[in-house]
């Protein structure tokens, strides 16, 4: 028997072709963790209006951001997995996706068949929210296999240090009028129902400021992006903040995206293209993004250390239980 670690990210279409994007969006947007609406109401809307109109448009965005090796989210997630495996040579480290391939259930079963007694599940999302973690939990639980979860790491000192260092390095490169910490938004109904996401996002911003007091707090803004559908989502929205900053004469901005640990459609298309164009069209000058963790070996080592800590805590709990 040997320890196992399953890293999980959101997923990506198999290709940027419209049919593959449509299949991916159908799986993603059919998850009740993502869309809190009765299926009898939501599915006709999804299949009849949203998928036919959104799939081809999203496909063009994926085509623009696709790397020669494949989806950026998959490519960078695989790189992280390989680096974590190198840091944990005695472990079985694998990668799965909530939607698309590799499948969570099949990967977890393969790990157990390979001798992993109780794999650790580590979603690659610093902050916990039902919309990302709910589907992971359901798929893992459906296997009936023993496991443990690391549900968030937004408050881990090493993670905050890594994030704060990236922000500070980028901030020093130019004179910025504002630094926006932009997190993926979620429906406000989830927060009302007890989802801790907003609290954890705000805590992340505050922790970075505490780690780097040289960063002017009066320039820092917390915002949210990637809203989908007509329901109210967490505000303020990044796009609106960008336009308002220009109106205030703040034309040089730095954007940080802590909820995305790797480049994906939201960073490469929504931010680098759409939000950049909005900002420039409004009269803004400099629009820069702090790079996500991507292939940062320090981040991969942090994930490896986090898994070791979890394994040691589990072993200690088992030992204590056997003695009592």
Swiss-Prot record:
Gene field: cpfC
NCBIfam families with a match to the protein in the record: hemH
Protein name: Coproporphyrin III ferrochelatase
GO biological process: heme biosynthetic process
Coiled coil, from the record: none
Enzyme class, broadest EC rank: lyase
Binding residues annotated for Fe(2+), in chain numbering: 184, 266
One Pfam short name: Ferrochelatase
